[in-house]
Every structure is written in C-alpha cells, then in structure tokens.
Amino acid sequence: MASVGVAPTSGFREVLGDGEIGVDDILPEEMSDMKIRDDREMEATVVDGNGTETGHIIVTTIGGRNGQPKQTISYMAERVVGHGSFGVVFQAKCLETGETVAIKKVLQDKRYKNRELQTMRLLDHPNVVSLKHCFFSTTEKDELYLNLVLEYVPETVHRVIKHYSKLNQRMPMIYVKLYTYQIFRALSYIHRCIGVCHRDIKPQNLLVNPHTHQVKLCDFGSAKVLVKGEPNISYICSRYYRAPELIFGATEYTTAIDVWSVGCVLAELLLGQPLFPGERGVDQLVEIIKVLGTPTREEIKCMNPNYTEFKFPQIKAHPWHKIFHKRMPAEAVDLVSRLLQYSPNLRCQALDCLTHPFFDELRDPNARLPTGRFLPPLFNFKPHELKGVPVETLMKLVPEHARKQCPFLGL
C-alpha cells in the first residue's frame, strides 16, 4: 500500500464498521503504529484543500514491495460523484496515463482493519468493480483517511431507470435481462467463491457502461462474511430493498437478503419505480404485505422466531400478474415471484437464477443490443465460479456457442 499526505476533509467523522468487530478486525497497538509508519514512509506532498475539489492534485507512490520498483502516481480530482456517512467518492484522472478512476475516501479508525479494503482485495470478476490500489492520507488533525482507487464506470442502473421514467417509457426488455443476469452473476461469485454477503444491493450500487451495458457491483462498505451462529446487525441495506427478515430485526440472516434485494431491483426495472416504497421499516412491511399477503406463522418463524405470536392484519396476496402490465413476459413475473419469498430458504439462489428461462434470449448466439452491438461478456466463467455445479446446470448455464470460453468444463 502507498501513502499520501493531503489536507483535511471536514464533516466525515463516522467510525467505519457496523459494530460487528471480530478478533481478526483488531490490529494490535504496536502493529497498528508500525503499519501506519510503514505506509507513511514515502510521505507525498501535502495538498492544500481537501483533495477532492476540482483541480487538486494528489501525489502518491505505489509498488516498492516484493522487488517491484516504486512508482509515483498523480491524480487530479475532477468532481465529486457520491458522498454519504462513509465519506466521499470523486472522479479523478491519472496524470501519467490519462486514465479516469474513482477514488473513495473514508475516515479510517486506526485501531481496526478496514473491512471494505480486505473484501475488495479478494475480488476479481467482470461484474464487480475492481480495486486498482489504495493509499492513506492524513490531515492536520492527524485523522487518517483510506483512499480506494477504483475503476471508473460512468453510469448507474439508478440513473438509467430515471432516464426511462422521465421519458415515460419502459426500459427495453433486453436491458432488464442483461442487467439482472449480470447482477446475479456477481452475486453468485461473491456468495459462492468469496463467502461474502453484500448487504446493500440497490440500483445506485450497480454501475453500468452505457455503451457496452456491462454491469459492475460496487460499494462493499457494508459487505461481510456471514458466519452461521454469529449475530449480525439487522439495520443494514437501504430502504425499498431490505429483506423482510431485516425489517423484523433478525440477526442470523443469510446471503438470501441479497437475493431479495435483487428481486426488488428487477421489479423496479420492470415497473420503472420501486415495488416497496416506504420511509420507515413499518411502512415497508405494510407495502410488502400488500403484495405478498400476510406471512404465515411458519414464514414468520423463518424470518425471526421472536415474532410468531405477533398479530398481523390478515391481508390476501395480490396476484403478481396484476402488479405488472398485461404484456409483461410470464418468465419475468415468474422470476420475481421466486425471489420475493418471505422464507429466505425458499428464495432462488443466485447461480440457479442464471439458468432461469427469463434469460434464454441472452443465450441466443444471434442476440444483439438495440444498437446492433454484441452483448457484453456473459459466459466467460472461471473454474472457481462453477466449482461443484452439477453437469445438467452447466449445460443450461453455458450455451453451446460459448463453451470454448470455458474449456475446463469439458462439455
């Protein structure tokens, strides 16, 4: 990791992490001091201002370990593209290469490792935003900031939905299929290969290249390895996309919360607006009950056993085909219904979703974007993505014309 000195960024004092600190997250004091000293070894220029304003230049060094030569890299901040309690994300240009990157700057508690950085270092997938490198920056008040240098993707699924909504148009179905398929592929990878639950799937965290329509999952600030038997906080995930077990306050949830969130995103792509709008948890539960009906005692037990005696208003489920317009493909409605189940264990798993008939059009060798361009890469699986997958699933998953991309399958 490299180091940099920049002047203060005000206003971001929220301690990172979510209160779920394990033994592995804590740095011993002497190691913590040593690590930070090591990372400040090549102190870069201290920049006036907060380093995120247009025109500010941040100079850092990378390499210098395992025999690699040290390199100086300069980034010119261009504009802020996102901010929140975590800190700020800004677009920057590398002056040496001309490459545009996104830099996520977060306040770092010196006592703990940064879980987002630990997670990002494990990730390598075409549908997950990639970490290029990272560096620390310090302020005059000796606050430590972690800067994650990420690949830059210009659009979000949220803005694409807004675009069609403003035009009063439905999103072309090929885009709905493409975006949802790629989200499931990213989820299958992080759930099965890395063992991580994202915990904040929403259209704003789904980046999209407007030319190729390749989608990348971003923002692993809430992501966590879920260990069976270990409690997790339930106040996680953004409103509209929160699984009902989270609204019920469950602390022993599974990666099925991400699958519920994708169900909400898919419904929003189809409808042009959120399926379960609600400002507070109770409002959202009401919206969910209006669609799925009152959960049965057994379903409540699956979500949070402490609520089985709670008296809910008895409401019948609203048929899915009445929620969507008449011309909605039956496969789309079927997939939504398999994702938005009260019982987490009944929700379709991400890998199985990829073989759903809704995505059959994407497996057609003649499928093209409305512009006439080829589809983005959808079948360039790596061996670890498909480890342990039954042959019959593989046959459905990788169409014949794409099998040369996966020679390790021996199909």
From Swiss-Prot:
Residues 75-359 form the Protein kinase domain. Its EC number is 2.7.11.1. Keywords: ATP-binding, Kinase, Nucleotide-binding, Phosphoprotein, Serine/threonine-protein kinase, Transferase. One of its GO terms (molecular function) is protein serine kinase activity. The active site is at residue 200. This is Glycogen synthase kinase-3 homolog MsK-1. It comes from Medicago sativa (Alfalfa). It catalyses: L-seryl-[protein] + ATP = O-phospho-L-seryl-[protein] + ADP + H(+); L-threonyl-[protein] + ATP = O-phospho-L-threonyl-[protein] + ADP + H(+). ATP binds at residues 81-89, 104. One of its GO terms (biological process) is signal transduction. Belongs to the protein kinase superfamily. CMGC Ser/Thr protein kinase family. GSK-3 subfamily. Pfam families: Pkinase. The keyword Transmembrane does not apply. The modification Phosphotyrosine is found at residue 235. PANTHER family: GLYCOGEN SYNTHASE KINASE-3 ALPHA, PROTEIN KINASE SHAGGY-RELATED. InterPro entries: GSK-3, Kinase-like_dom_sf, Prot_kinase_dom, Protein_kinase_ATP_BS, Ser/Thr_kinase_AS, STKc_GSK3. Leaves, petioles, roots, stems and nodes. It is an enzyme of class 2 (transferase). It comes from the Eukaryota. The keyword GTP-binding does not apply. GO terms for cellular component: cytoplasm; nucleus.
